Structures are given as C-alpha cells and as structure tokens.
C-alpha cells in the first residue's frame, strides 16, 4: 500500500520569538485508503499537525509530501484540492443560504460545470442522508445534521483524503455513532483515506493505526488493539479506559481472571461463553 501522505522532521512554533516548539521533529506516514487516528491531550500538537498538512499553517522546517508532491507555497492550492477538512464546529464552515448552496460553494470556486455540480451535490447529500434538507437553512439544523452537511461539502470536492479535526466532539453519543457510520460508508465507497483527530474510543477502534502525540512529538504508533492494551495508562493520553478493559478488571477483582490482553466486546463475549461452558 502506497503512502498518500509523508511527514518528515516537521518543526513549528506559532511565535518565532519563542524558544518552545508546538511541533518538534514530527515524522509519520499515512497509507492510501487507511483510517489513521491521531490522539493526545489538548496542546499535544494534533490539530497543528493536520493544519500543516492542509497548508493552513507553514512549517518552520521539514517536509510534507502529498500524493507524491512536496507541499510548497507554489502548489498549496493545488494540493489542498486533494484534502477535505471537517472541523469541530460546523457553523464556522457554512457560507451558503441553504444546505444545497453550501455544499455547492467549493465546487463553484473550482469552476465545476453546473450540470456536474448539481450531480455531485445531490450524490454527496444522498450519501450523508441529508437530501430532504437541501433547501433548509444550515442554521436550523441540529449539530449532527450540520456535521453531515460539512462532510457532504468535503466529499463533493472528490478529495483523496478527509481530515476530521475533532468533528464528532460536540455531538451526543448517538449522533457521534451515526456520523462515524456515515464516514465509514463514504470511505468504503470512494476508497478515501481518513485522518481523525479524536478522543472518542469508537472512532479510535475503527482505525487501522493510531498515532499518539505528546508535547509536540510522536509518542507512539500502534494498532487500536495494542493501544487499548495500555489500560489505565490511556487516561494520561486523554482517553477513557475501554469498557471491556474495565469489565475485565472488575471480573478479575471478583475472582474471574481472564487475562490482561485487551479484548473487543465480541472477543470478550466469546471468552465468557467458553468459560461458562467449562463451569
């Protein structure tokens, strides 16, 4: 699997007069078609990293390669078309008077012919389940609906990568799961690469890989299963301890020790059934 994004030795600070770097010698890669989660405490450098990838910020030094091209001042607008970004607060992204207008906005700026534009808008709204709201004012939508429209606007541009910058953090648990399912379906349909900045365990669990950032550096890269196996140490990374890990600890405290390796809910259920049959 080829790398769609490669980050080499990034250094960045918001104030050139400061000695402290927000990002210090950050390197990693993102494979084409994978779902990569980036986690860490507030101030760890997660959002700064993806803003550098999207060209919203400029690194002091280092290299960002997107789809085989190094990101520079000359090609930042060209490469930005390969990336769709959805932020925490969708209200900050709305520019159209209606949902349909808002999704079409980026396509108009790109000079997409009217017929193709209407087709893309309809397809994108259908994908996120918002077709019936296309004439609605964005301000009258719920938080989850607004995020769906923001995602539709990104998908309509046909990017290769979608970056979710804590896009589910303001939603209730049900809305969060619905949005994650939507992103998952879109990813499969278009073979999109997803980069997710998140604190949500359900999002992390869907990832192929997880990068942990700490104090502006990459602390570790692992699979979700390996990460969840860190148990109570996850709290220091800004995550909750997974339900299955907490349940296994409770069971062990009551005399039913089934090991310390992290198990998914399905794996734990199967393990408990096996133990039950042996009793």
Curated annotation (Swiss-Prot):
Annotated membrane topology: Peripheral membrane protein
Species whose genome carries this gene: Streptococcus agalactiae serotype V (strain ATCC BAA-611 / 2603 V/R)
Record's protein name: Energy-coupling factor transporter ATP-binding protein EcfA1
A GO molecular-function annotation: ATP binding
EC annotation from Swiss-Prot or TrEMBL: 7.-.-.-
GO cellular component, one term: ATP-binding cassette (ABC) transporter complex
InterPro entries: AAA+_ATPase, ABC_transporter-like_ATP-bd, ABC_transporter-like_CS, ABC_transpr_CbiO/EcfA_su, ECF_ABC_transporter_ATP-bd, EcfA_1, P-loop_NTPase
Subunit structure of this chain's protein: Forms a stable energy-coupling factor (ECF) transporter complex composed of 2 membrane-embedded substrate-binding proteins (S component), 2 ATP-binding proteins (A component) and 2 transmembrane proteins (T component).
Key words of the record: ATP-binding, Cell membrane, Membrane, Nucleotide-binding, Translocase, Transport
Signal peptide: none
All residue ranges annotated as the ABC transporter domain in the record: 5-240
Binding site for ATP: 40-47
Pfam family membership, one: ABC_tran
Known role: ATP-binding (A) component of a common energy-coupling factor (ECF) ABC-transporter complex. Unlike classic ABC transporters this ECF transporter provides the energy necessary to transport a number of different substrates.
Disulfide bonds, paired cysteine numbers: none
Localization terms from the record: Cell membrane
Family, per entry: Belongs to the ABC transporter superfamily. Energy-coupling factor EcfA family.
NCBIfam families: ECF_ATPase_1, PRK13635.1, PRK13648.1
SMART domains recorded: AAA
PROSITE patterns noted in UniProt: ABC_TRANSPORTER_1, ABC_TRANSPORTER_2, CBIO
EC category name: translocase
């Amino acid at each position: 699997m080829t790398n769609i994004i490669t980050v080499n030795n990034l250094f960045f600070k918001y104030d050139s007069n400061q000695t402290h770097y927000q990002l210090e010698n950050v390197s990693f890669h993102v494979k084409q078609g994978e779902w990569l989660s980036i986690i860490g405490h507030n101030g760890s450098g997660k959002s700064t990293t993806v803003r550098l990838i999207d060209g919203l910020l400029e690194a002091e030094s280092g290299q960002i390669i997107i789809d085989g091209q190094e990101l520079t001042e000359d090609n930042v607008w060209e490469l930005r078309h390969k990336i769709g970004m959805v932020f925490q607060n969708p209200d900050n992204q709305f520019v159209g008077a209606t949902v349909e207008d808002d999704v079409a906005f980026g396509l108009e700026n790109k000079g997409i012919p009217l017929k193709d534009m209407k087709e893309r808008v309809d397809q994108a709204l259908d994908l996120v389940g918002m077709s019936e709201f296309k004439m609605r004012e964005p301000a009258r939508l719920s938080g989850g609906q607004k995020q769906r429209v923001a995602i539709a606007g990104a998908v309509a541009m046909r990017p290769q990568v979608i970056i979710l910058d804590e896009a589910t953090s303001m939603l209730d648990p049900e809305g969060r799961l619905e949005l994650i399912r939507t992103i998952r379906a879109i990813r499969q349909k278009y073979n999109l690469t997803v980069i997710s900045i998140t604190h949500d365990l359900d999002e992390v669990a869907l990832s192929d890989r997880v990068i942990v950032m700490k104090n502006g550096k990459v602390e570790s890269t692992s699979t979700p299963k390996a990460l969840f196996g860190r148990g109570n140490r996850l709290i220091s990374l800004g995550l909750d301890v997974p339900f299955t890990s907490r349940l296994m600890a409770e069971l062990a405290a009551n005399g039913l020790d089934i090991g310390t390796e992290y198990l998914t809910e399905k794996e734990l259920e199967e393990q408990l059934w096996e133990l039950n049959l042996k009793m």
